[in-house]
Amino acid sequence: MFDFFRKSKYVTVKPETKQKEIPDGLWQKCPRCGEIIFNKELEKNFKVCPKCGYHFKISAWERIKLLCDENSFVEFGREISGGNPLNFPGYEEKLAEAREKTGLKEAVVTGLGKINGREVVLAIMDPNFIMASMGTAVGEKICLAMEKALEKKLPLVVFTASGGARMQEGIFSLMQMAKTVQLVNRLNAEKIFYLVVMTDPTTGGVSASFAALGDIILAEPGALIGFAGPRVIEQTIRQKLPEGFQRAEFLEQHGFIDAVVSREQQKEVITKLLAWHSQK
């Protein structure tokens, strides 16, 4: 007979509150469309979002790996590094932090390499190093690359990515604009092919000097290109800017750059341009 007065025994189960931890570094979220992308898939796709085509920022060495033939790149100018000519407070610590973070001494990597068998001089700016701002060392390395192209009669390919002049170096930073432009004039006089690829962002003193003077100027999709940022311009002129103003596609439509080329097509396009402008 069933005992209605007997108390049933219950076991209290505590709800699971601890969430499963997902290891860091497995995926990234696209800042444009919000798509969650596994890093391995992103690497295979040239660090480009497979859903919306957003181009993630990449380091100088990642770009060299994508662009140059295997084991063909030989760096020069690595010993050049910036100092603190104005004794700007905290600048030396900022440089040390950037060097530890990136493994670079400065914001641009220069060297000789081959692109589908064609030898070129390369200068590739790295936005991870103080936004690749241009100080004395960056200006010196860009000029060194130009001098190497003149010496060896080789095409020069420069990938730009910069927040502009490095404010901690003041007038010494601004002097690099004139310095690099003088070397571009020498390239023109010697008929050395000079190709610029603008990546996000290319702004300030870099956009107003050597970056805007290429024989051919390409840009990555969506790259921000201009001297001052859109917010500063709007505040100055007190007008709303057109949609996409200062983006690569807008500038291509208005004749400022020659073509917008996605990252996966760059090696092929650059190879064709080198062939068309070859002196040999």
Swiss-Prot record:
The family line of this record is: Belongs to the AccD/PCCB family.
| Single GO MF annotation | acetyl-CoA carboxylase activity
Which organism is the protein's source? Carboxydothermus hydrogenoformans (strain ATCC BAA-161 / DSM 6008 / Z-2901)
- Which cofactor does this sequence's record say it needs? Zn(2+)
* Catalysis: reaction(s): N(6)-carboxybiotinyl-L-lysyl-[protein] + acetyl-CoA = N(6)-biotinyl-L-lysyl-[protein] + malonyl-CoA
Subunit note: Acetyl-CoA carboxylase is a heterohexamer composed of biotin carboxyl carrier protein (AccB), biotin carboxylase (AccC) and two subunits each of ACCase subunit alpha (AccA) and ACCase subunit beta (AccD).
Chief site of localization: cytoplasm
> Which cellular component terms (GO) are annotated to the entry?
acetyl-CoA carboxylase complex
Q: What is this protein called?
A: Acetyl-coenzyme A carboxylase carboxyl transferase subunit beta
What the record notes about the co-factor is:
Binds 1 zinc ion per subunit.
This protein's record includes keyword Zinc-finger: yes
